[in-house]
Curated annotation (Swiss-Prot):
Family to which the UniProt record says this protein belongs: Belongs to the thiamine-phosphate synthase family.
Organism: Geobacillus thermodenitrificans (strain NG80-2)
Protein name: Thiamine-phosphate synthase
Gene Ontology cellular component annotations, sorted alphabetically: cytoplasm
Enzyme Commission number, as recorded: 2.5.1.3
Domain of life: Bacteria
Free-text cofactor note: Binds 1 Mg(2+) ion per subunit.
Residues that hold 2-[(2R,5Z)-2-carboxy-4-methylthiazol-5(2H)-ylidene]ethyl phosphate according to the record: T143, R144, S145, G175, I195, S196
Gene designation per UniProt: thiE
InterPro entries given in the database record: Aldolase_TIM, ThiamineP_synth_sf, ThiamineP_synth_TenI, TMP_synthase
Pfam families referenced in this protein's UniProt entry, alphabetically: TMP-TENI
GO MF terms, alphabetically ordered: magnesium ion binding; thiamine-phosphate diphosphorylase activity
Keywords attached to this entry: Magnesium, Metal-binding, Thiamine biosynthesis, Transferase
Length: 221
């Protein structure tokens, strides 16, 4: 299997749903199915928080959600846990600045998708050097989904990265909704990643569809 192309990566980043067992009162599988029906293009399993599953329970949930994504042809990305991603043959991993070194992760995962969090030009350039296929930039707006999140940066960081010649596929993260999606796409993001905008929505399918429409319309401008 070859590395994903930049063009396909950008398409996959359009509506990037992220969740784990702690992000909804409902079973994760039910929420994910509705999100996939609504048009989610990429999924990240992010199992974090004080009551996060561990060990066999975490792997069992990962495999369950991976199976669901496979039926929709949507790539399955694992957050932080590189060993789990390899054990279940996930489609990729996402690591942040405080996780395993991205260069080391690239060596371990071969051609799988590698996503890296970046907050500035230096971190973006380092991620590219390390072999990232995309970078997650944010939090763009205040978020309640990550208790150790940095200060919200606003869409300006996206514009700044593009002005500094960063051309790697970028997904915006942090407080993203269908209402602010146009601003982040116009500022230079290729897609949006969300947790609560879908996982906490009364209708995850409609929420995913609204995000997909907002990204599509912003790209037409
Ligand atoms: N999980 C993420 N996914 C993305 C993605 F690009 F995929 F949208 N961007 C950023 C993060 C944040 O990654 P990190 O800084 O390690 O914190 P955590 O492990 O708590 O998520
Ligand atoms: Mg992390």
């Amino acid at each position: 299997m070859a590395r994903i192309t930049s063009e396909e990566m950008k398409e996959r980043l359009a509506v990037y749903f992220i969740m784990g067992s702690q992000n909804s009162e409902r079973p994760a599988e039910d929420v994910l199915k509705e999100a996939l029906d609504g048009g989610v293009t990429l999924f990240q399993f992010r199992e974090k928080g004080s009551a996060a599953l561990e060990g066999e329970e975490k792997e069992a949930l990962a495999r369950q959600l991976q199976r669901l994504c496979r039926t929709y042809g949507v790539p399955f990305i694992v957050n932080d846990d590189v060993e789990l991603a390899i054990a279940i043959d996930a489609d990729g991993v996402h690591v942040g600045q405080d996780d395993e070194d991205a260069r080391r992760v690239r060596e371990k995962i071969g051609d799988k998708i590698l996503g890296v969090s970046a907050h500035n030009v230096e971190e973006a350039r380092a991620a590219i050097e390390a072999g990232a296929d995309y970078i997650g930039v944010g939090p763009i707006y205040p978020t309640r989904s990550k208790d150790d999140a940095n200060e919200a940066q606003g869409p300006g960081i996206l514009r700044h990265l593009r002005e500094q010649g960063i051309t790697i596929p970028i997904v915006a993260i942090g407080g993203i909704t269908a209402d602010n999606t146009r601003a982040v796409i116009e500022a230079g993001a290729d897609g949006v990643s969300v947790i609560s905008a879908i996982a906490s929505a009364p209708e995850p399918k409609a929420a995913a569809a609204a995000l997909a429409t907002a990204v599509r319309e912003a790209n037409l401008r």
